[in-house]
Amino acid sequence: MKYDYLVVGSGLYGAIFAHEANKRGKKVLVIDKRPNIAGNIYTEEVEGINVHKYGAHIFHTNNKEVWQYITQFAEFNRFTNSPVANYKGELYSLPFNMYTFNKMWGVVTPEEAAAKIEEQRQEIKGEPKNLEEQAISLVGRDIYEKLIKGYTEKQWGRPCTELPSFIIKRLPVRLTFDNNYFNALYQGIPMGGYTKMVENMLKGIEVRLNTDYLENKEELDSLADKVVYTGPIDAYFNYKLGTLEYRSVRFETEVLDKPNFQGNAAVNYTDAETPWTRIIEHKWFEFGTQPKTVISREYSSEWKLGDEPYYPVNDEKNGALYAEYKKLGDAETKVIFGGRLGEYKYYDMDAVIAAALAKVKEVFE
């Protein structure tokens, strides 16, 4: 059986490419080494709740074309991301807004809040030398100490004084009472979970799970004229130029015999002492009324080969190494490299969709 396209990985990029190729009459085989489809947006039903197995995914975009495209596969609810920060039992609104400043300093007007931030920013003179100085120069010491420092150090596994200032280009400060984290026109969660959405994309397409492409590369390559590869690009080339680095995340998920644990989908723990970075309570993504609840504690961790890769470490060294791998990739005429791992890129979901659609256009039009 000969296929036009072998698509390696059933995450957003792979699923969209497969859907569009199939729609154009191409014969497509999708494979995934996991026992399930949907890549990192996979949701699993537990106690009637759609659990985001690989971390919280909240869809948001300003791109109308992307929104119109994705909503043909699922109806989206009106979920708005409004995280809460817990600093040693003190609760603050994220993003930083008037609720945050009122709680922090007792200020009531935007003018008072702006004056307080301006006063605290003066501590840093000249060019910020590291992330700590950068953050203080943007929002002042109080907000930095309580809401940025501990969280960031847990995330990156090193002190803020050793992290480069460019990691935090800007910190959104809102002198309003708006709790909506994303400034996006369109936002929500697919009702019934992301897995169902990806299932709809892959309707009528052959999918083989528990199939590791790199372990059976020759045999699988012989099945198709072209390959769309969405795995790690360095793994494709057997790491021959070296290993690209990632940050990883570990989740501890549990079912609780109560209807409400924290009253919000996401609570960030911004002190250094709490080992987890945040707790996700999954039912609130879909305004759940189930009698039980499912929570996931999220821990940032150093990544080593074999761990699940989450966030590319986009520093100079890794960027230069990726550029070398990209040259090798460009020389593979039979293979399209795409997605977060194939392009070693921190992609929001809407950007992955846009990239996949752009590639479809390039290939088929």
Language-model features: where?
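N-terminal Rossmann-like FAD-binding beta1-loop-alpha1 element of flavoenzymes
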Residues: Y3-V30, V360, F364
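Mid-domain catalytic core of redox enzymes
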Residues: R24, L214-L328
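Active-site/ligand-binding neighborhood in enzyme catalytic cores
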Residues: A85-S93, M98-K226, T230, D234-F237
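Short glycine/proline- and charge-enriched loop/turn segments
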Residues: E45-K53, D178-Y181
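N-terminal FAD cofactor-binding segment of flavoenzymes
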Residues: A56-E90
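C-terminal catalytic lobe of FAD-dependent flavoproteins
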Residues: E308-E365
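Short, solvent-exposed loop/turn segments at secondary-structure junctions
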Residues: L12-Y13, P35-N36, Y99, E153, ...
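Glycine-rich FAD pyrophosphate-binding loop
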Residues: H19-E47
